[in-house]
Amino acid sequence: MSRIIVITSGKGGVGKTTTTSNIGIALAKLEQRVLLLDADVGLKNLDLLLGLENRIVYNGLDVLNGECRLTQALIQDKRQPNLTFFPLSSNQLKLPVTKEQINDLVDQLKNNYDFILIDSPAGIDEGFQVAIHTAKEAIVVVTPEVTSIRDADKVIGLLEAKGITDISLIINRLRPEMVKAENMMSVTDVKDILGIPLIGVVPDSEQVITASNRGEPLVLDDKVSIPGLAFINTARRIMGEAVEFIDFDSVTSTNPLKRLIKNLVKRSDKSY
């Protein structure tokens, strides 16, 4: 039986889809059977980051409309045979997918994979509600910024209201030099504010951007890099391993940004 995990963020532009692609491939390299489901109807980008955009013939909407079999819409990654990609829709047509439909598709697939990772749309609208409907676990991706953390707080509330209580945190694009200068939230600050278990910390890096632009997620590179190692370690923690975190958070001080974000979160709308 699959572990069905939705990867979400609330705010767009935090690297959620990049995180999904790298964690998916990292899990596959760790001998797990992984399905990456792009649930961002109309604005899909996971295919580009995986370098699979030219191999898409059918998608989930085609399956639902009876135009193809489910197996025809699944794309096996030739670089990593344990990884399968499933686009829910095309960029050309933004048609609604219902909660019942995504649930039916996942039900047909869940016995064939160890992990199903669902790349959720940014925001908290209907697309988000559909993406989280079939999930049993959630990973919230944030950057150490005011807006990202405030939106993540809202998303966590929505997930809990849906009954998803197994929620983990990934802090992305951390810049240690800014943390030391007290111009960015530290790992400890973000953990304390959001109050959910930390499962990954990924530093900001041009290597991630370059790899994404090539359609080759960083974890595919045989050369060891700090962000690549961070993604792999995150995948290992998802599998239940006790993996020590890279120490990015060596500065302890009273950061004024921490107080600011705490106040913002307290003022945010809690009526989910």
UniProtKB/Swiss-Prot annotation:
GO molecular function: ATP binding; ATP hydrolysis activity
UniProt keyword annotation of Cell division present: yes
InterPro entries from the UniProt entry: CobQ/CobB/MinD/ParA_Nub-bd_dom (IPR002586), MinD (IPR010223), MinD_FleN (IPR025501), P-loop_NTPase (IPR027417), ParA/MinD_ATPase (IPR050625)
GO cellular component, one term: cytosol
Keywords: ATP-binding, Cell cycle, Cell division, Chloroplast, Nucleotide-binding, Plastid, Septation
NCBIfam families: minD_bact (TIGR01968)
Entry protein name: Putative septum site-determining protein MinD
Organism expressing this protein natively: Emiliania huxleyi (Coccolithophore)
Lineage: Eukaryota, Haptista, Haptophyta, Prymnesiophyceae, Isochrysidales
